[in-house]
Amino acid sequence: FWILSLLFFLSCNRNSFSGIIPQTQFTNQEFDRVNTYYIYDYVSKDQILEYSSKQVHKFGRKSIYYFFSHNANIPTDKLKYADSIIDIRKNLKKYRHSLKFVSVKQSSEKMEIIDCLDDPSNLLCNFR
């Protein structure tokens, strides 16, 4: 009985991030990062926070993680070969209507998450 319970628990937790699909990863010369992801509707804010906290981050730098609706069509090549974070933000601005969450890890290692559906005027959500 215990073995079956353990297997059930492990199989449920194994896919706790299955609704988060990595897309583009960009790192500039200073090791600031921008990552984009597609997410399904059932992914919660808590799951995104947990997932974001496990991503690679260089101490003293800034990491921004953009989580778009799974049916968004983000131009990954334009992002992958961008010259700067400013270029990436210009490209992503065109798709802000599909942006669900933004997660930011500041140089202090503090993680912040913004729900863009609840706060669309947030500067990180509208790319201003």
Q: Which residues does each predicted region cover?
A:
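C-terminal partner/receptor-binding element of secreted or periplasmic proteins
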Residues: 89-128
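Short, surface-exposed polybasic-aromatic patches that bind anionic ligands, especially phosphate groups
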Residues: 21-34
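Bacterial signal peptide processing site
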Residues: 13-15
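Mature extracytoplasmic domains of secretory-pathway proteins
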Residues: 33, 37-99
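Sec-dependent signal peptide recognition
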Residues: 1-6
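C-terminal motif of bacterial Sec signal peptides marking the signal peptidase cleavage site
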Residues: 8-11
